[in-house]
Amino acid sequence: CAVSTGAVGIDIEAIKYIDLNVGKRFFSESEYAYINNAPPNLKLNYFYDLWTLKEAYINKIGKGLNMRLKDFSICFDKNKIYVESAKYPENCYFYKYDIIKNFKMSLCTSIYQTKCPIIFIRQEHLINDFIDLINTKEHNLSSLTEL
């Protein structure tokens, strides 16, 4: 989950072996070349970097998988990541993280952040907080009807 005052998209993937030739179906020519030109021990990491950045972007613009991943390119220029898309020329700021061993996470926002803090929440805490929130709202609503 990602929270922002602007549009935001996020993707998290477990790094698992994949036939890198699948990239021909989903990546632009320049992205596929980026993976193929990577050192052999980094190709899988490059694949998942691109995959999570692309997914974060389409989530940010609200297209989900209704947009073909080949229709735009994620580009790297020194320390900057940007998107080339004639169809959706929006301001995007990308952040990528190796959050836990064998996991990649990418974030795409419409607002520049100097830091994007990551807060890990255990599932049971999230569920309990949600239940507490619902109970509080129900209590507030029931007290309004008593007036």
Task: Identify the role of each PLM range.
Residues 1-147:
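Core catalytic alpha/beta fold that binds nucleotide/phospho-ligands
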